[in-house]
């Protein structure tokens, strides 16, 4: 079974949409979330390999988790953040909420005209998913949402947004999740 893990909480005092801006590292809470989820993964799941986004927050999460799992980690771009709305990057959440695209993003983000569609995100992640077994994918919220939406043929893109260091996986064609209590 392949499992998706969203990275831990990020230190972001200015509430910036950071996407791929360098330097956004895990907060103290994010570190604790990753430590907790590592214990859960070791206890309850068979993980043979870790595939992680190369972005700092995901790399840090994977390294913390791997202190307990002790598996091979591969950092690859195919599991990175959704290509998204470029003019949002570097803006505050408040500024993003004022944009014309924000309402579409909230209601039905599959209708957005962006550099990378959510379906394109699904396709790049699905290739990895189909070609691997017992892998922990450490990635980002919209990447996980895109994958689950299309893989499960859902009618609601916003059904289950993973919070920081939550797990999501598919079992018998059904979404299963573990909500990190930290």
Each predicted region: which residue ranges?
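Active-site signature of alpha/beta-hydrolase-fold catalytic machinery across serine-
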Residues: 64, 146, 150
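Generic beta-sheet signal
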Residues: 2, 131-142
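Generic structural signal for well-ordered alpha-helical scaffold segments
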Residues: 35-42, 122-133
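Short, active-site-adjacent cap segments at secondary-structure transitions
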Residues: 57-59, 82-83, 143-145
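Short glycine/proline-enriched coil/turn segments at helix->beta-strand junctions
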Residues: 43-46, 67-72, 130-135, 153, ...
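Domain-level recognition of soluble alpha/beta enzyme cores
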Residues: 154-181
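Active-site-proximal alpha-helix that buttresses catalytic centers in soluble enzyme cores
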Residues: 2-72, 165
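Phosphate-handling substructures
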Residues: 25, 67-124
């Amino acid at each position: 079974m392949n499992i998706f893990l969203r990275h831990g909480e990020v230190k972001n005092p200015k509430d910036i949409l950071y996407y791929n801006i360098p330097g956004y590292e895990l907060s103290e809470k994010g570190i604790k979330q990753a430590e907790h989820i590592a214990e859960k993964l070791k206890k309850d799941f068979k993980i043979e390999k870790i595939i992680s986004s190369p972005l700092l927050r995901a790399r840090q999460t994977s390294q913390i988790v791997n202190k307990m799992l002790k598996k091979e980690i591969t950092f690859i771009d195919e599991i990175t953040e959704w290509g998204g709305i470029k003019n949002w990057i570097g803006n505050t959440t408040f500024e993003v909420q004022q944009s014309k695209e924000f309402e579409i993003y909230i209601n039905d983000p599959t209708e957005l005209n962006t550099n990378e569609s959510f379906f394109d995100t699904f396709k790049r992640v699905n290739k990895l998913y189909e070609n691997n077994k017992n892998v922990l994918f450490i990635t980002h919220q919209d990447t996980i949402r895109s994958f689950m939406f299309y893989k499960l043929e859902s009618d609601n893109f916003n059904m289950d947004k993973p919070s920081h260091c939550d797990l999501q996986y598919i079992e018998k064609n059904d979404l299963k999740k573990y909500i990190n209590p930290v």
